[in-house]
């Protein structure tokens, strides 16, 4: 599953995982475990946890594929992920399908900022200076403008990412997204 942050890819990944009985490995879930286990004291350390989470995701996917299983990867994949994914695929010939959730940037940004204000969102994704929070230390909270959001994800190639067969989902309006229909496309692509 690929696409912009807050585009709906994780919700569909969980749905597809249950319907297909295929495990989903979500980089954000791994990051949250790393935030809670290791934490970070500055933005550089937080970035290292992001890199570690991506490496753990690829390592785990390789192990599942080694055992003859299938796997769903959930991440806002970017151009920089192509090399590592290509290596996994080279070592494990498999049917690769990208389900990319596209969304108008303005709407993705609105959802992104709304999600970061949700109390159920893990604070490690929002805090920039340190996690867990240290009493008496004011932490910077990410504050991205719509313009910087658009530039960041355009520059990184999130909206053009694709490996293998591509299924594009316009997720600008969640009400128009049909999970059963996407699942049917996915199943048809697996044949």
Residue ranges and their predicted role:
Residues 8:
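Conserved glycine(s) of the Walker
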Residues 29-31, 102-107, 174-175:
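Conserved nucleotide-binding/hydrolysis micro-motifs of P-loop NTPases
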Residues 11-66:
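Conserved substrate/cofactor phosphate-moiety recognition/catalytic segment
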Residues 4-5:
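The conserved Walker
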Residues 49-96:
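Glycine-rich phosphate-binding loop used to anchor ATP phosphates in small-molecule kinases
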Residues 117-177:
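Small-molecule kinase domains that catalyze NTP-dependent phosphoryl transfer to phosphate-bearing small molecules
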Residues 1:
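Hydrophobic anchor at the beta1->P-loop junction of P-loop NTPases
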Residues 92-113:
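Conserved phosphate-donor/acceptor-positioning beta-strand/loop module used by diverse small-molecule
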């Amino acid at each position: 599953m690929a696409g912009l942050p807050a585009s709906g890819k994780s919700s569909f990944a969980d749905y597809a995982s249950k319907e297909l009985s295929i495990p989903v490995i979500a980089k954000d879930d791994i990051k949250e475990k790393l935030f809670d286990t290791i934490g970070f004291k500055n933005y550089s350390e937080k970035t290292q946890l992001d890199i570690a989470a991506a490496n753990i995701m690829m390592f785990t996917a390789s192990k599942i594929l080694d055992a003859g299983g299938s796997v769903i990867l959930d991440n806002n994949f970017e151009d920089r992920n192509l090399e590592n994914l290509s290596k996994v695929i080279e070592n494990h010939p498999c049917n690769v399908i990208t389900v990319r959730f596209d969304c108008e940037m303005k709407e993705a940004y609105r959802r992104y900022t709304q999600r970061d204000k949700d109390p159920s969102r893990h604070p490690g994704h929002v805090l920039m200076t340190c996690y867990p929070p240290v009493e008496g230390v004011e932490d910077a909270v990410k504050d991205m403008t719509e313009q910087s959001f658009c530039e960041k994800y355009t520059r990184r190639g999130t909206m053009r990412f694709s490996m293998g067969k591509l299924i594009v989902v316009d997720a600008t309006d969640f009400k128009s997204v049909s999970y059963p229909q996407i699942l049917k496309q996915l199943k048809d692509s697996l044949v």
